[in-house]
Amino acid sequence: LLPILGNLLNGLL
């Protein structure tokens, strides 16, 4: 769950 959340945040940023 941590990696996917990081990926979503990175996509937004």
From Swiss-Prot:
The keyword Secreted applies. The modification Leucine amide is found at L13. GO terms for cellular component: extracellular region. The keyword Secreted applies. It is found in: Secreted. Expressed by the skin glands. Keywords: Amidation, Amphibian defense peptide, Antibiotic, Antimicrobial, Immunity, Innate immunity, Secreted. GO terms for biological process: defense response to Gram-positive bacterium; innate immune response. Has antibacterial activity against Gram-positive bacteria. Belongs to the frog skin active peptide (FSAP) family. Temporin subfamily. This is Temporin-1Tc. It comes from Rana temporaria.
